Amino acid sequence: MITPTAAHAKTQATLRRACRSRAAAVFDATAGRATIAVMGPRSRELLARITPADVSNEAQRWGRAREIEVADGYAWCLRVSFVGELGYELYPTADVAVDVYDAVLAAGHDLGLRHAGYHALDSLRVEKGYRHLGHDIGPVDDP
């Protein structure tokens, strides 16, 4: 399960409570993964340059995640975007995160890839109308 940073502690506590009386366990793998967001109208084109996986709309619909080969390693690839454009979040293991990041930068150079800060992404999120737990809604809101 991938959860927003603002909801991490609450999600983990809820899952642990739910699993107490069951034959299940909760393991927090946060420290073992990095997050690299590739967002924008050419994100699919960029991603196709760094993976042999099919990243077409038919192969990976919005909201779906799967493991893909990328930059001599593997990463979870989640098709999601909070900026109002096509986008993907890559979750490589920590040991290949720098390699994946470098591959993204190299593949996006001629596509006009730019770094975007948190406030820029947040502004795009607001324009799109996506609500964010901890900013726009809280634990008592029912979106």
Positions of PLM-derived features:
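Conserved, structured C-terminal
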Residues: 2-143
